[in-house]
Amino acid sequence: MAKRRKGNREKEKETTWQERVIQIRRVSKVVKGGKKLSFRAIVVVGNENGQVGVGVGKAGDVIGAVRKGVADGKKQLIEVSLTKASSITHLTRGASGGAQVIMRPAAPGTGVIAGGAVRTVLELAGVKNILAKQLGSDNPLNNARAAVNALETLRTFSEVAKDRGVSIEHLYT
């Protein structure tokens, strides 16, 4: 009986996570007997409350690739510090491969102004007001990783105040 309850708790924890597939691509590998086909899935996992991760999964079928992508995304979760207006604390940039992403905080009511994979990452991270721009590449995997890289570099108000040696109240005066 105790095992069953524990399993239910684990399922409840899993239901708080949302996952969105960014891309499914059929890929092939040349082997001695010809071409071996498989699928690659790029998946973003987040709880819309400050945690997000990007995962990649490969398998012989689409469902298996998505499942592996979700597992990989949960291994690569990051914490995102958000303001009371559900925006980011300061301007930030991120890069991965040839992709670059610039993110700027926005006023309440602005919404998520971003495109493609970056928009998906921001929505699943719980960001509600932000301006973002993709530069350099239209590759969904590199853009998603660049967005995560940009969110990783964010610092909270308390971290900035501590580095400057002032209190949070005196940070902007």
Swiss-Prot record:
Keywords: Ribonucleoprotein, Ribosomal protein, RNA-binding, rRNA-binding
One Pfam family per UniProt: Ribosomal_S5
Annotated ranges, domain S5 DRBM: 17-80
Taxonomic superkingdom: Bacteria
UniProt keyword NAD present: no
One MF annotation (Gene Ontology) recorded for this entry: structural constituent of ribosome
Gene3D superfamilies referenced in this protein's UniProt entry, alphabetically: 3.30.160.20, 3.30.230.10
One biological process term in Gene Ontology: translation
One GO CC term, this protein: small ribosomal subunit
Regions crossing the membrane: none
PANTHER family attached to this UniProt entry: MITOCHONDRIAL RIBOSOMAL PROTEIN S5
Subunit structure: Part of the 30S ribosomal subunit. Contacts proteins S4 and S8.
Reported function: With S4 and S12 plays an important role in translational accuracy. Located at the back of the 30S subunit body where it stabilizes the conformation of the head with respect to the body.
Notes concerning its domains: The N-terminal domain interacts with the head of the 30S subunit; the C-terminal domain interacts with the body and contacts protein S4. The interaction surface between S4 and S5 is involved in control of translational fidelity.
Family membership noted in the UniProt record: Belongs to the universal ribosomal protein uS5 family.
Protein name: Small ribosomal subunit protein uS5
The organism's taxonomic lineage, starting at the top: Bacteria, Bacillati, Cyanobacteriota, Cyanophyceae, Oscillatoriophycideae
